[in-house]
């Protein structure tokens, strides 16, 4: 089966054929750096991390560019509120972004351009649009003339006439005076008095949101790319406007394939900062949710579908990851492999290995894994293959609870180790990284008693508040690090370290 993606542009699943053989150019819309990232951001970037890892595994050379929007209204307002400069705010949140993404084992992009560092390219891009008569200046602003682009609406499927009526009702008084058409969008915005601004041929101001991405794509990857990525909330107007201005400027298709991930929902509503129903990545990690549990949770659902966030779903994902991690730990605990194989434990993308020692059943599972992933990144199907591969490993693990490894038939043991190597390779394609300390308390003998007592108090408070999901989660977390909790009368809880 050939690699297929659901292309938002064509509204159907298509065979993937890169512009240049064995090379893939990808652009992913990044964050506006005015605050910490939430689970919705994690969902998006985890999905695209797996896409990138899978393409590398299949032998493609991948150039992956993701931007930072480091100047816009939200950043200006937040900086004013905090009493700092927009540069200070952006720099701090870029650092925090990297911390979150590194913790989640998301590969860093090949390049991460920032809007404020690409002003020359942005201004040149706007000037080209003016020369082509598809942009016009008005009172210090510059707008893209939507009527001049005949294919406007081809990505979102929206009819331009309906959008004009809708946009007209939302215009401010000054916009009505400046725009020729209510749907025209800003390429350059005149700055208000006292606001951060940059010099340009049209006066002091700052770039519009959409033009940033078009200029950065052209600067980093060229006029046409293979894949453009983003959340489904960006299809209109952001990606629609990107297409319009890029194709008007360059006379070429901006991207062959447009992939969009579904939203994370909380109680039936999209998780977003504007609604105030968001949960930051940082807060989830501080609550004790492991990075790999978050990755596992996200990969259980196809990237295009909505993802419902509940504590119950997180708890189920934690148990699923724990089972898988037990099997991934097996080879490192019972057999020290060579250094090349040990690299699987690291956050490195890997290429498909020869797998010459696999039996017929394992070859079929390898083929099934690739078939699932080729089918529009069916990560839930791919995870099912990992669990099938885990079965003989789990059987050996259970056997070794009572017996010594030397009592296992050597040929059988060798086949199990070959399956473990394949399991480790395929898990790495999904970015699932084995956590040895998590499953083996002997690797982490020094226990922080103050932290233990603090968590026991937190669990007692959760029980008192009838938050039994949290109480059970804390108990499970203790078990995972080799600690057993014993509840006594009068609300007293004692703990002991489990024997190896």
From Swiss-Prot:
Zn(2+) binds at residues 29, 213, 238, 242. It comes from the Bacteria. Binds 1 zinc ion per subunit. ATP binds at residue 273. Coiled coil: none annotated. Belongs to the class-I aminoacyl-tRNA synthetase family. This is Cysteine--tRNA ligase. The lineage of its organism: Bacteria, Bacillati, Cyanobacteriota, Cyanophyceae, Synechococcales.
């Amino acid at each position: 089966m050939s690699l297929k993606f659901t292309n938002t542009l064509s509204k159907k699943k298509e065979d993937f054929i890169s512009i240049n053989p064995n090379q893939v150019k990808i652009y992913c819309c990044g964050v506006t750096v005015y605050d910490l990232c939430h689970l919705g951001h994690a969902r998006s970037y985890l999905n695209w991390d797996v896409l990138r890892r899978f393409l590398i595994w299949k032998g493609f050379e991948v150039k992956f560019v993701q931007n930072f929007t480091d100047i816009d209204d939200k950043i200006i307002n937040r900086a004013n509120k905090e009493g700092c400069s927009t540069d200070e705010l952006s720099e701090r949140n870029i650092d925090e972004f990297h911390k979150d993404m590194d913790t989640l084992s998301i590969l860093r992009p090949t390049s991460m351009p920032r809007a404020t560092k690409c002003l020359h390219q942005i201004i040149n891009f706007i000037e080209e649009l003016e020369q082509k008569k598809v942009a016009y200046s008005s009172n210090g602003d510059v707008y893209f003339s939507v009527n001049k682009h005949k294919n406007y609406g081809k990505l979102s499927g929206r009819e331009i006439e309906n959008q004009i009526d809708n946009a007209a009702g939302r215009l401010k008084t000054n916009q009505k005076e400046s725009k020729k058409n209510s749907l025209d969008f800003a390429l350059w915005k005149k700055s208000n008095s006292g606001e951060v601004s940059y010099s340009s041929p049209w006066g002091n101001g700052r770039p519009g949101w959409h033009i940033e991405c078009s200029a950065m794509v052209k600067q980093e990857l060229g006029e046409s790319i293979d894949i453009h990525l983003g959340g489904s909330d960006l299809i209109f107007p952001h990606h629609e406007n990107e297409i319009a201005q890029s194709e008007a400027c360059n006379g070429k298709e901006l991207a062959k394939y447009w992939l969009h991930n579904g939203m994370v929902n909380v109680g039936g509503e999209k998780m977003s900062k504007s609604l105030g129903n968001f949960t930051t990545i940082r807060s989830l990690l501080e609550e004790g949710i492991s990075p790999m549990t978050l990755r596992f949770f996200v990969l259980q659902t196809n990237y295009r579908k909505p993802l419902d966030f509940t504590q119950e779903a997180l708890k189920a994902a934690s148990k699923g990851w724990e089972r898988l991690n037990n099997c991934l730990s097996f080879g490192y605990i019972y057999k020290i492999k060579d250094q090349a194989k040990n690299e699987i434990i690291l956050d490195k993308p890997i290429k498909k290995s020869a797998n010459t020692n696999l039996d017929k059943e394992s070859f079929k599972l390898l083929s099934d894994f690739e078939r699932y992933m080729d089918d529009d990144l069916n990560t839930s199907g791919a995870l099912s293959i990992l669990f099938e591969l885990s079965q003989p490993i789990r059987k050996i693990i259970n056997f070794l609870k009572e017996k010594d490894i030397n009592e296992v038939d050597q040929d059988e043991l060798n086949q199990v180790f070959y399956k473990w190597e394949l399991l480790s390779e395929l898990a790495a394609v999904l970015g699932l990284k084995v956590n040895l300390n998590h499953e083996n308390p002997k690797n982490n003998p020094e226990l922080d008693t103050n932290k233990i007592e603090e968590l026991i108090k937190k669990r007692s408070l959760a029980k008192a508040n009838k938050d039994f999901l949290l109480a059970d989660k804390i108990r499970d977390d203790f078990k995972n690090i080799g600690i057993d909790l014993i509840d006594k009368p009068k609300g007293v809880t004692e703990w002991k370290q489990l024997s190896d």
